[in-house]
Amino acid sequence: MTDKINNLINQWLKWDKNEITRKEIEQLKENNNEKELLVRLEERIQFGTAGLRGAMRAGFSCMNDLTVTQASQGLCEYVIETIEQSKSKGIVIGYDGRHNSYIFAKITAATFKSKGFKVYLFSHIVPTPYVSFAVPNLKAAIGVMITASHNPKNDNGYKVYWETGCQINTPHDKGISKKIDENLEPWSNVDATSDIKYGNGDDGESMIDPLSVITELYNKNIKEYSVGSKIELANEPIVYTAMHGVGGVYAKKAFETFQLKPFIPVAQQIEPDAEFPTVTYPNPEEGKGALKLSIETAEANNSRLILANDPDADRLAVAEKLADGSWKVFNGNEIGVLLADWAWTNRSTLTKGGSTLENNKYFMINTAVSSAMLKTMSEKEGFIHQECLTGFKWIGNAAYNAINNNDGTTFLFGYEEAIGFQYGDVSFDKDGVRAAAIFAEFALSLYKKGSSVQDHLESMYKRYGYHISKNRYFFCYEPSKMVSIFNKIRNDGKYLTKLGDDDDEQFTITRIRDLTTGYDNGYPDCKARLPVSSSTQMITFYFKNGGIATLRGSGTEPKLKYYVEMIGEVKSNVESTLTKAVELVINQLLKPIENQLEPPKDD
């Protein structure tokens, strides 16, 4: 065993106080497993704009008591240095139902308490959106949510919200990361093992439980978005699944707030279960495989609508039984434009004072990998459309900044294709709880009129043109391979000029935007207008036929994602062109066999 590895082992054993993770490292040492020890100890888990996310096991590169302690110490010091009166403003801490989430939350709470912070620690598991909502409403300095969202059961994460209630963005991530590196040794005066004492938080020992206050205030705020008292709704059953996560009781409360008939829960998945026993991936975005029990429940209860939250309830999936008896799982773009249309129709409920402004005083946002249909809608209806980078750290901050510019504009809606939706400005992050209640009301209004969600989507396509997309991914477990694949596509700046056969002009590439290098030949100076990041891989190709294809490395999972969209007036033509485009993107750009990329198991 090398001196380097021995030094890393000794450092870990000096700092780690958890017997389970200490034994993991000791066992690896005893087995002389140098390779695994290097994987666990050589690199530190990186703190980025998404905070931390990784597998729960021993080692500096993983999620465990020690790395959460170190992250909390660094965050604490950064907040003290950056936000005035941060200790009296306090920190809000929430956690989901995963293994170790409560323990990690206690560590975070004890760390901040040791520095004299007021600590709001939820007494029960909560949806991620509750923390985003709670931070500004409690006038706190910072928020932390312990969750790995829809990741596999062995993962966990540490998500940070700024005092605005928005996810942190650059440069905060770099500042926090630097402070973590300066505070690696656990502070001696922190005790995270004692039982939590709740009180008013003023005695230097107790913590404040914000659960009842925030639950009441949150539902009071989202009630403003309900239009059920003004329109007729069908009396039809709706099936809901929490996907073994936290959403059940909170979605139930949101339905009650909207005065909707109680949903029918998927019994096997309504209670939190850290093992996620009924699904391979606890991710409703995976489609019919993840929604198998939901469909069975719906069939048994004569329901044609399924609403599904992911485990931390910040995202929403939707499925509907069609007239032919088959089930359609709507993708994120379809749900996004449907909710955008609902927000546009009911924009007075999203306007302060309940009045209606000029069309160009409203704005909506979606991400660069989401459908161009929202932009098409904006051009036809006259509202402002803004495009931003992938992730709600961009959408939330863009919405917050625009609202606080005081230029008379009103934010209506923002979404990303990965089934994340922000309806209104109750909070500035994606929220599957309020989205579920809002979508239920929308769907029931359609059913009352003899229509359906799919029928309404078709009517939107007739108005704005068919915008049909295919988004999928391959697993890419090695970061160096991800970079290599994208660099091969760049070909030292000599990008492909077309896809397909020489005599097929429709896939001639008319524009390339590379947000890793900052190149965008859609502008005279060939400089990208969206923010550029050399540490993330993302290239978009625009085709002569109006189609768009984006390739992107995920920031939170080992996935190389592709997003392809075709636009046109005739559905069958758009669908066939999309099928061909996806095939070309996979075979000519991604080259999964050559690059040894692993497809999803259900493909």
UniProtKB/Swiss-Prot annotation:
UniProt remark on cofactor binding: Binds 1 Mg(2+) ion per subunit.
Localization in the cell: Cytoplasm
Taxonomy, superkingdom: Eukaryota
Entry-linked Pfam families: PGM_PMM_I, PGM_PMM_II, PGM_PMM_III
Subunit structure: Monomer.
GO MF term list: magnesium ion binding; phosphoglucomutase activity; phosphopentomutase activity
Functional summary from the UniProt entry: Catalyzes the reversible isomerization of alpha-D-glucose 1-phosphate to alpha-D-glucose 6-phosphate. The mechanism proceeds via the intermediate compound alpha-D-glucose 1,6-bisphosphate. This enzyme participates in both the breakdown and synthesis of glucose.
Binding site for Mg(2+): S149, D310, D312, D314
Keyword set includes Lipid metabolism: no
Cofactor: Mg(2+)
Residues with PTM Phosphoserine: S149
Stored CDD domains: PGM2
Residues engaged in binding alpha-D-glucose 1,6-bisphosphate: R53, S149, D314, R315, T390, E416, K430
Organism: Dictyostelium discoideum (Social amoeba)
Active-site annotation: S149
Name this protein carries in UniProt: Probable phosphoglucomutase-2
GO aspect biological process, one term: glucose metabolic process
InterPro entries given in the database record: A-D-PHexomutase_a/b/a-I (IPR005844), A-D-PHexomutase_a/b/a-I/II/III (IPR016055), A-D-PHexomutase_a/b/a-II (IPR005845), A-D-PHexomutase_a/b/a-III (IPR005846), A-D-PHexomutase_C_sf (IPR036900), A-D-PHexomutase_CS (IPR016066), Alpha-D-phosphohexomutase_SF (IPR005841)
Catalytic activity: alpha-D-glucose 1-phosphate = alpha-D-glucose 6-phosphate; O-phospho-L-seryl-[protein] + alpha-D-glucose 1-phosphate = alpha-D-glucose 1,6-bisphosphate + L-seryl-[protein]; alpha-D-glucose 1,6-bisphosphate + L-seryl-[protein] = O-phospho-L-seryl-[protein] + alpha-D-glucose 6-phosphate
Its EC number(s): 5.4.2.2
GO cellular component, one term: cytoplasm
Annotated family: Belongs to the phosphohexose mutase family.
Record keywords: Carbohydrate metabolism, Cytoplasm, Glucose metabolism, Isomerase, Magnesium, Metal-binding, Phosphoprotein
